[in-house]
Amino acid sequence: MSYLRGMEVRAKKSLGQHFLTDQDIARRIVDALQGSPVLEVGPGMGVLTQYLIPRLADGASSGGSTDALRSEAGSASPDSSLRSAPPTCSASGPLPLTSRGWLRSGLARPASTARQLKAIEIDKESVAYLKKHFPELGDGLIEGDFLKMDLRGLFPGQFSIIGNFPYNISSQIFFKIIDNRDLVPEVVCMIQKEVAERIAEKPGPKTYGILSVFLQAWYNIEYLFTVGSGAFNPPPKVQSAVIRLTRNSRTELGCDEKLFKAVVKTAFGQRRKTLRNSLKPLLQKAGRLSEPGRVHSRSAAAECGLSSAAAPANPIPEGPVFDLRPERLSVEDFIDLTLRLTP
């Protein structure tokens, strides 16, 4: 554990905490956010919170509302906005706007932000710090685990999510966001650079994978900028990156979603194999392919989202797509593949 500039919160390895200390980068992250209201995930010592409070205190946002984002999403293509990264940023900034910072900045301390800004933090030490230095959060400060939290009812309607996600649970956070995609039209977050590149990757390279497909099915991805390890205390061993997810126009996949997930996971689980070979275990488990000496149950089929009818097992359908490896397939390709494998 290490103290952040001698202040009250210790960075805990068990929580994957690396506190962002670069104020310029903190401002850039907040400036990238377009919608409101906002849920901040893992505020820590409030490096983003300090810039969110004046922006959201009066119910106004320098960006658009989630309604505006929803309108934009309706006109955006599902797979647009995969952009490249600007250069790395690293710089120190002004005094954070904690209790002393507000006084020195000359800005009027804003009123409560609870209706427009909520923050969920699992670390008790950070919660105590935030209560002391950011009282305007009020009831909007929630002590708890985001992964176990029911997001419905937090706000009257849709809301944006912002945060510096812990590296060790970033994938779990994204899967929860996918499950709540109708509530969350926008996400601005900082994650491990390698994961950010994977998420924003187009089909083809080996970095393209499960999370790429699942997120791009519902969101347009923008890689905004890279952040060096020197912007944190303690500094991580890897670089970080900031990305923005904006809900695309897709309202449904047009195929069985459970089977779609099973196909994607199975295909990338043996990504060095062609789909013809990698998908065999999935269909065998569901009773769609014969396998000597094995009895296929309806429960096994249900786990895969497939039907285990009593009819004779069918082979994998023919076609050139089955000679490809999974990284060559776009979201639409996986949807088409799922439809071809649907009983």
Predicted regions and their residues:
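Catalytic core of IPPT-family isopentenyl/dimethylallyl transferases
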Residues: 320-333, 337
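Catalytic cores of RNA-modifying enzymes
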Residues: 1-78, 98-266, 288, 293, ...
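Active-site-proximal or metal-binding-adjacent scaffold patches in catalytic folds
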Residues: 281
